[in-house]
UniProtKB/Swiss-Prot annotation:
GO cellular component: cytosol
Gene Ontology biological process terms in this record: regulation of carbohydrate metabolic process
Protein name: HPr kinase/phosphorylase
Keywords carried by this UniProt record: ATP-binding, Carbohydrate metabolism, Kinase, Magnesium, Metal-binding, Multifunctional enzyme, Nucleotide-binding, Serine/threonine-protein kinase, Transferase
Organism for this UniProt entry: Staphylococcus aureus (strain NCTC 8325 / PS 47)
Amino acid sequence: MLTTEKLVETLKLDLIAGEEGLSKPIKNADISRPGLEMAGYFSHYASDRIQLLGTTELSFYNLLPDKDRAGRMRKLCRPETPAIIVTRGLQPPEELVEAAKELNTPLIVAKDATTSLMSRLTTFLEHALAKTTSLHGVLVDVYGVGVLITGDSGIGKSETALELVKRGHRLVADDNVEIRQINKDELIGKPPKLIEHLLEIRGLGIINVMTLFGAGSILTEKRIRLNINLENWNKQKLYDRVGLNEETLSILDTEITKKTIPVRPGRNVAVIIEVAAMNYRLNIMGINTAEEFSERLNEEIIKNSHKSEE
């Protein structure tokens, strides 16, 4: 759970008042600048957000009649308000300090400019409050594409990752991948701290990839864009041989491209994954070989049908 105390420690902010409220949870990544509230309009006050007071808000506050000031500040300090932050190192109004002390609302001062602090806060909160999950698999950076390799236990995921590392690609996580959703369409994968940089090879044991292959062979985290699912070759199953069938894998409501690769002796899975990653990059650049082939095939069929009619 993210608390105001962790926010203060991580961003190195200065607490002025409301120390007893540091244990308040932060549940909303949005940030509010209470301009209308300063004017007395609290009907739609987003009190569960962090409140940011900059030069504009405080200069307007100084124009308020003395009789209204204390009341406005008390209304800002709701029980669910995680923090009120004054930017640019400005001096908080005395009425705000008193209200924060009395109502246990953390009052914080930051030296950053308002827009700069808002950017820092947004980045921090989006990461800290992102939805998370974990998946059994291996995450590798192949030609800049985050490839999540999945499949049944013993199918050869770790061995394939080792071959990819030897070919110059970078390991992110083996066996267990911790995934968090930053945006609606952005998934970031990283390893648990316990097994960071480690790779388990059956018959060999656990190896430290960074020690063996150097710092350039590992990454601490990577955006997941492509899923390669390995499965034992099934003669009864029809596998995609053209590339027109688009499969997807849903993780935390985010869809990523999925390719199912049948595994059998003699197939170089690492090379296939390299080609899949390069082909994915071509696809997002607007080049789809499967569609081009399909169009050429259709044109040839139409041409031949016209010849037969003649």
